């Protein structure tokens, strides 16, 4: 028999849960930043302001997208992984000192 415990909406989460959620959020943000740096190294021409706008495949479908918008809003979506780097980044992401390393 399973029971579900529901916290009242106005109550704060326990400290342990708050800490865990904060840690997960921080790690996700750091992983996106790391992936974005990796993306810039792999595709440097995508991140230059003088890039031909037709070079970006997303912009062929929507000419209103500007390169600056893509840099900011689609940073997470523009991460292109290769298989060797995926494991390396996953390993570094799992290390306890990951947040201090970059």
From Swiss-Prot:
It comes from the Eukaryota. Keywords: Cytoplasm, Nucleus. GO terms for cellular component: cytoplasm; nucleus. GO terms for biological process: deoxyribonucleotide metabolic process; protein localization. The keyword Cytoplasm applies. Its main location: cytoplasm. Residues 46-62 have a biased composition (Basic and acidic residues). Regulates the ribonucleotide reductase activity. PANTHER family: DAMAGE-REGULATED IMPORT FACILITATOR 1, DAMAGE-REGULATED IMPORT FACILITATOR 1-RELATED. Belongs to the DIF1/spd1 family. This is S-phase delaying protein 2. It comes from Schizosaccharomyces pombe (strain 972 / ATCC 24843) (Fission yeast).
